[in-house]
């Protein structure tokens, strides 16, 4: 229980505690850190969040987050536009970009499939992916879903969905442990997984 009568502070702690990787104790520490220097720390955070809320949009093509409707990756003339890496979320896209090893395009699914919960595959952006493969003459689709059970389930579903397209379908290779999530891998491991990707059937 917090030593305060201010419900707003309690609500702020609660909101921080819902962020990935944070619990109530870490959330309290963050809130205290911000409040101890409100004029600099808190106001700076507030101003930054307001600007992000105004500027950041989802890329109309791949689903990345950027300040333009077409993100800097999709609009770049230096990317290999014959290859698409299919990732579960923007977090995995950013992880692959940190590796500086992949120079193709991306397609963010937004979700994965859980065999246990029997989710509807329509939650994935697969119709958009297939449309891109035909429209952009894609030669290779790299399935870069996580090595979790949900990621594997999603990978197999993607493969079945793309069978009518002639593009080569590959999967990130060794270096990713079973149950591993791309966002937590170091750049060297992820680079090796990209370079050693395997055909996926």
From Swiss-Prot:
A molecular function (GO) term: zinc ion binding
Signal peptide segment: none
Domain named Toprim: residues: 82-177
One Gene Ontology biological process: DNA recombination
Key word Metal-binding present: yes
Record bears the keyword Metal-binding: yes
UniProt zinc finger (C4-type) residues: 59-74
Keyword line: DNA damage, DNA recombination, DNA repair, Metal-binding, Zinc, Zinc-finger
Domain of life according to the entry: Bacteria
One Pfam entry name: RecR_HhH
Family: Belongs to the RecR family.
Function in brief: May play a role in DNA repair. It seems to be involved in an RecBC-independent recombinational process of DNA repair. It may act with RecF and RecO.
PANTHER family: RECOMBINATION PROTEIN RECR
Protein name per UniProt: Recombination protein RecR
Gene this chain is encoded by: recR
């Amino acid at each position: 229980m917090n030593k305060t009568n201010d419900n707003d502070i309690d609500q702020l702690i609660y909101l921080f505690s819902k962020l990935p990787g944070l619990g109530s104790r870490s959330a309290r520490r963050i809130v205290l850190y911000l409040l101890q220097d409100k004029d600099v720390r808190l106001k700076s955070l507030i101003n930054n969040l307001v600007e992000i809320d105004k500027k950041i949009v989802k890329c109309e093509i791949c689903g990345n987050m950027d300040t333009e409707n077409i993100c800097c990756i999709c609009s770049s003339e230096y990317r290999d536009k014959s290859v698409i890496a299919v990732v579960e979320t923007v977090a995995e896209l950013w992880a692959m970009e940190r590796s500086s090893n992949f120079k193709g395009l991306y397609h963010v699914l937004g979700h994965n499939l859980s065999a246990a919960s029997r989710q509807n595959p329509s939650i994935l952006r697969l119709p958009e992916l297939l449309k891109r493969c035909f429209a952009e003459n894609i030669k290779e689709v790299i399935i870069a879903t996580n090595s979790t059970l949900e990621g594997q389930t999603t990978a197999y579903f993607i493969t079945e969905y793309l069978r009518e397209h002639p593009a080569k379908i590959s999967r990130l290779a060794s270096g990713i442990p079973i149950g591993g999530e791309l966002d937590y891998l170091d750049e060297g491991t992820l680079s090796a997984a990209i370079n050693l990707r395997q055909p996926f059937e």
